[in-house]
């Protein structure tokens, strides 16, 4: 298992090259990588060992909410999580746009935190008379489901019967 995500310093080297060609340095570097991986695994186990948001680690805990004024975008509050036993951090409130209303039937989209890029994306679901949410991608953590209706003009925090609304699906460690 290799260390993934932005929490690992080695990702700053574009092609995983090492600055020194010494075999001794390369062995030392591999031991540092193993130690960092062990440290991340132990930290994950200390928080419960699963994937999820770390409760009360920051003001927002990766909560998804409607924008002010409401529109076809949502905001995700900063927070910390573990995804695949690796730390994830969203340092500032982030606006996630690109949400399009369905054409003929309701649809459920998934707001997910992505480990490899430390950002938040929306995974589009499939339109259906009785829609279901898509599964999170690999190395992603589900934060919220967006129930979207045909002809809607905004995503709200609660159901008003006309527009789309947000359902919190965060899990905590």
Q: Where do the PLM segments sit?
A:
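Beta-strand-rich solenoidal segments
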Residues: 2-173
């Amino acid at each position: 298992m290799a260390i993934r995500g932005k929490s690992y310093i080695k990702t700053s080297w574009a092609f995983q090259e090492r600055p020194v060609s010494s075999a001794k340095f390369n062995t030392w570097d591999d031991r540092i990588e193993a130690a960092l991986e062990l440290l991340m695994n132990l930290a994950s186990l200390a928080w419960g060992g699963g994937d999820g948001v770390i409760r009360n680690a920051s003001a927002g805990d990766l909560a998804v909410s409607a924008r002010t004024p409401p529109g076809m975008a949502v905001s995700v509050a900063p927070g910390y999580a573990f995804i695949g036993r690796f730390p994830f951090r969203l340092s500032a409130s982030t606006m996630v746009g690109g949400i399009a209303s369905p054409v003929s039937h309701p649809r459920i989209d998934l707001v997910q935190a992505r480990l490899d890029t430390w950002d938040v994306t929306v995974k589009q679901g499939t339109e259906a008379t009785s829609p279901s949410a898509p599964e999170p991608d690999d190395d992603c953590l589900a934060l919220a489901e967006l129930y979207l209706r045909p002809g809607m003009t905004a995503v709200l925090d609660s159901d008003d019967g006309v527009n789309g609304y947000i359902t919190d699906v965060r899990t905590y460690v």
